[in-house]
């Protein structure tokens, strides 16, 4: 069972890779398609996984992962438990600005199975931003795709003067401070 490491491979020229983990099915796939449709000046690789660890037999073919977005469906406790279990397979150096938690289904608060405090605690414990969205709505899905692409661009080192760690600190929740 391989642990994902952020700097174990060299970066590819004019390219960035994002790994979307969790919340199997339509919303994750639709988000990936929305990201691919956006105009960008670099190549993007999107890998989808329902959980970690990733299979090790194709590890030598997998590009360097610049950003991991853990997708949590607020309607499913299994989704949160799956993400929590997957976090054990991520090297701690990824949490220096290269991880975010994407919480979907927030438009249906009455169907909520996951406590919001658990999600906020996850973001605090792993020093990673928590992004709330509704992937079933086209406009919000496009806005989320644009936001993830900008984060990916920063995490891949394609924005001069801005590091992933610095950007992550800017996105942290300051309500508790």
From Swiss-Prot:
- Localization terms from the record: Nucleus; Chromosome, Centromere
A Pfam family assignment: CENP-M
InterPro entries hit by this protein: Centromere_Cenp-M (IPR020987), P-loop_NTPase (IPR027417)
Record bears the keyword Zinc: no
Q: Name one GO cellular component term.
A: chromosome, centromeric region
Q: Which domain of life is it from?
A: Eukaryota
- Which keywords fit this entry according to its UniProt record? Centromere, Chromosome, Nucleus
Stated role: Component of the CENPA-HI complex, a centromeric complex involved in assembly of kinetochore proteins, mitotic progression and chromosome segregation.
Subunit structure comment from the entry: Component of the CENPA-HI complex, at least composed of CENPH, CENPI, CENPK, CENPL, CENPM, CENPO and CENPP.
Q: What is this protein called?
A: Centromere protein M
Species name: Gallus gallus
From which lineage does this chain's organism come? Eukaryota, Metazoa, Chordata, Craniata, Vertebrata
Q: Which gene encodes it?
A: CENPM
